[in-house]
Amino acid sequence: MDFESPPTISAAVEQIRRGHLTPRQLVDRCLQQMARFEDRIHAWVCVDQAGAIEQAERLGDLARHGQLLGPLHGIPIGVKDIIDVQGMATEAGSPLLKGRVAQQDAPVVARLRAAGAILLGKTVTTEFACFDPSPTLNPWNLEHTPGGSSSGSAAAVALGMCLAALGSQTGGSITRPAAYCGVAGLKPTFGSVPTDGVVPISRHLDHVGPIARSAADLWTMFAVMADGAGADVTLPELATPPTLSVIGEFFLQQADDAVRDVTVAASDALLKSGAQLQMVNLPESFVLVLAMHRCLMAVDAAETHLQTYASHGASYGPLVRTLIDEGLSTLAIDYALALRHQDRFRRDMQAIIRQDVIAVTPATPTAAPRGA
């Protein structure tokens, strides 16, 4: 393949519309990247090569007749293996779900398919999208972690095995692997993207979001995921320069020098482009956030896995077992207090960060650490 990848998903779709690029060319490029790197990186659980080529040919025929299904027409994507794709297994990185074939698309997948996306296959996740490491390796240094739990999605996008991928986040499972693998990730506003057809961890914390090569691609993916094939993916024009709210405490304090320098450089670049800057402090309620988050996640995980864990506990990874055991031993009053604190912290942050303000903070305190 001797063509350069388009700079954005929208640019690729425009090239397909003009006949300068075909969906089959994009799929072939992704499959070539898999052939080069997958044996070392282990980003994919399964790839439906024949199905992807069939989808590409069908979408190419439509494009030649001037018919585009939507903003993702002909774009190859990966889907994290906790999200249902009709006819593919959803195993969530666990032997307990081995061979569990989805009978229908999750709503978020159905929206992407209706918008013209080509579903290449399922990407690797840590077990039940929790803490036990996956077999995926960091694409830039095999001795360092790719981050989890959306390990495969981030690595696949980084190496051009797909133009975008679905991930999920309960704590940092989109933003962390995206940062470690040098790509972009978006945790959407809670509830803006449906989580039906997704293996849950915590119904109070789970999000489905995109991983892609750029913020522009995240916007295109998110618009379709939230609003469907008819979504307006035009990048909005800003009437006034945006305001940057730099959260100076905790995140920047925890960051190492390299991450801190990159964050400051990014803020400076935005300032030079016309943005306004303000320093903000985290609310008092932040002090308990990590403990309350752990409480919610543990109890919700225990509720989700209650019956299976009782009969097959030994089949769970050690870190998932620890989480579930914590949830089983948590008092009801502590869980209720954690839910109340979640509501309080959300209100406190909304008072600090308005919708027209960009919060600036490192995605992770360090670059990808050595190890799994």
Predicted regions and their residues:
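Acidic/His- and Gly-rich active-site-bordering loop/insert found
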Residues: 52-54, 62-135
